[in-house]
Amino acid sequence: MSKSVFVGELTWKEYEARVAAGDCVLMLPVGALEQHGHHMCMNVDVLLPTAVCKRVAERIGALVMPGLQYGYKSQQKSGGGNHFPGTTSLDGATLTGTVQDIIRELARHGARRLVLMNGHYENSMFIVEGIDLALRELRYAGIQDFKVVVLSYWDFVKDPAVIQQLYPEGFLGWDIEHGGVFETSLMLALYPDLVDLDRVVDHPPATFPPYDVFPVDPARTPAPGTLSSAKTASREKGELILEVCVQGIADAIREEFPPT
């Protein structure tokens, strides 16, 4: 029998047996294909939540579904904007419908415990809408016990002491961390071959007005696409972030889905 935590690496009989046990937690990473500056690959928002899911699953005995590779449109003030070559996005209705369809299928399999791990800020409310529509559909079908936990891994990095270690020069806020120290450090810890620190563009933090304008003016986004400099990123910082996220998420899932 396969020992993999990835559903896609199991046979259907192995998967069926795990789900039939009744307390199996499934985890679904939801990412995006989005530029992350000159120094990192474009599938950061898929790679990172998938890696976190894998490590959490190994600690708690969960399974990881294949992640969603595409997400909602990159917004200028959180992801640099949807105008960059390579950034490939979904309409909100498409993402919502995909989440809804997957939940319905998992329920058909007999699963009742799901964790949706977001890796792309812009996905958030469309994931929630998909969950809401799916649970309503399941209730109409007589399924009342399907439970979903939705989270973003970065929300577990909140200890001021940890923030100080990551940003000793001062933390300017999550809203400009796209392609910055946080994501780059995690990538250095997990996928160092996909990071080239020599290509980091050291630029001042992006500044935006307290409102949005459409159509977007690309000139308001720093030229490399990152919203802050990643020059102080390091593998050590990434390892710290990873442990904080994995332990915090594992604890949260154990609390929400206690053993039966």
UniProtKB/Swiss-Prot annotation:
Known outcome of mutating residue 154 to A: Loss of activity
Entry GO MF terms: creatininase activity; hydrolase activity, acting on carbon-nitrogen (but not peptide) bonds, in linear amides; manganese ion binding; zinc ion binding
UniProt EC number: 3.5.2.10
Reported regulation of activity: Is markedly inactivated in vitro by heavy metal ions, N-bromosuccinimide, ethoxyformic anhydride, and dye-sensitized photooxidation.
Binding locations of Zn(2+) 1: 34, 45, 120
Cofactor: Zn(2+); Mn(2+)
Natural source organism: Pseudomonas putida (Arthrobacter siderocapsulatus)
InterPro entries for the chain: Creatininase, Creatininase-like_sf, Creatininase/forma_Hydrolase
Entry protein name: Creatinine amidohydrolase
Positions bound to Mn(2+): 34, 45, 120
The record's free-text note on cofactor binding: Binds 2 Zn(2+) ions or 1 Zn(2+) and 1 Mn(2+) per subunit. The Zn(2+) in the metal 1 binding site can be replaced with Mn(2+); however, the second zinc in metal binding site 2 is much more tightly bound and cannot be replaced. The enzyme with one zinc and one manganese ion is more active than that with two zinc ions.
Residues at which Zn(2+) 2 binds: 36, 45, 183
Pathway listed: Amine and polyamine degradation; creatinine degradation
Temperature-activity note from the record: Retains 75% of the activity after incubation at 75 degrees Celsius for 30 minutes.
Gene3D superfamilies documented for this protein: Creatininase (3.40.50.10310)
